[in-house]
Amino acid sequence: MNTADFDFHLPEELIAQTPLEKRDASKLLIVNRETGEMQDKHFHSIIDMLEPGDALVMNDTRVLPARLYGQKVETGGHVELLLLKNTSGDXWEVLAKPAKRLKVGTRISFGDGRLSAVVTEELTHGGRIVRFEYQGIFLEVLESLGEMPLPPYIHEKLDDRERYQTVYAKESGSAAAPTAGLHFTKELLAEIQAKGVHLVYLTLHVGLGTFRPVSVDNLDEHEMHSEFYQLSEEAAATLRSVKENGGRVIAVGTTSIRTLETIGSKFDGQIQADSGWTNIFIKPGYEWKVVDAFSTNFHLPKSTLVMLVSAFAGRELVLDAYHHAIQEHYRFFSFGDAMFIY
């Protein structure tokens, strides 16, 4: 299969620039992958698609305010850093602008000097390893000085940075939000739990690779980015019990899917507690191990996420659903509407 097989025309005005006032007021396109039937609903209706004894699996990662603006100590020149991942202790892999002037040993100061960094290693493509120096707790300093790294297709300023976090975000470490979870409110989750559905949390820290376009024609040549994931013993035990009792594992978003299917692939279809790095690429032809249904937002043309959804529901049905969503003026991408596929 070729990358072009997953292309579609999206009018630019359908790219959501801001979140809706109410999280669960977004639209929900429900798709039955067996019959091809589609229903236009609102997100709150997801509760009607869940049965007592099912598990709803969510990614509790928290987005870091990972964009930092500073000055070089020696020259006062402006520097922008985007934190990608914590490599060890206070050392981080970052994307730097302008990278060519940031040699090993360059010192950078941020804000009122409460945070500084020194470049310790040069990587390719504008990447650097920097070591941070600060007073107090790093994440608290970052919360006060950093800005949210919104996706490249969002041009509006975000008034409330909590709107780019899920209501259950807990484990700091992502460069982007697991956006399928943005539609849930605490009230809706309480209603779902009261219905007898198990709420299960895992962690996958979303990397910037999630926005990287596929640059090859042949899908077999595409290399996926790696992301850190973790599933606790308690969560794994709940999911095993759900499966044994005939319930469904319903994933919220592609990050939850990739974590569950990584674990299922690693343990021969079994669900075990695990943590590590995954670069799983789920595309048509993939044999599903764990996930029975899922919710997800509408994704970019030719992206690996459209390919993942197509692996579950079939390419033609997914493209039909996307064309339906475009005709019905659904909102696309991170702050957009959602679909539920079962």
Swiss-Prot record:
Compartment(s): Cytoplasm
Main location: cytoplasm
EC category name: transferase
Metabolic or biological pathway, per its Swiss-Prot or TrEMBL entry: tRNA modification; tRNA-queuosine biosynthesis
Domain of life per record: Bacteria
Keywords: Cytoplasm, Queuosine biosynthesis, S-adenosyl-L-methionine, Transferase
Subunit-level organization: Monomer.
Mitochondrion is among the record's keywords: no
Catalytic activity: 7-aminomethyl-7-carbaguanosine(34) in tRNA + S-adenosyl-L-methionine = epoxyqueuosine(34) in tRNA + adenine + L-methionine + 2 H(+)
Pfam families documented for this protein: Queuosine_synth
One cellular component (GO) term of this entry: cytoplasm
EC number: 2.4.99.17
InterPro entries: QueA (IPR003699), QueA_dom1 (IPR042118), QueA_dom2 (IPR042119), QueA_sf (IPR036100)
Signal peptide: none
Annotated function: Transfers and isomerizes the ribose moiety from AdoMet to the 7-aminomethyl group of 7-deazaguanine (preQ1-tRNA) to give epoxyqueuosine (oQ-tRNA).
Assigned protein family: Belongs to the QueA family.
GO biological-process terms attached to the record: queuosine biosynthetic process; tRNA wobble guanine modification
Organism of origin: Streptococcus pneumoniae serotype 19F (strain G54)
Name of protein: S-adenosylmethionine:tRNA ribosyltransferase-isomerase
GO molecular function, one term: S-adenosylmethionine:tRNA ribosyltransferase-isomerase activity
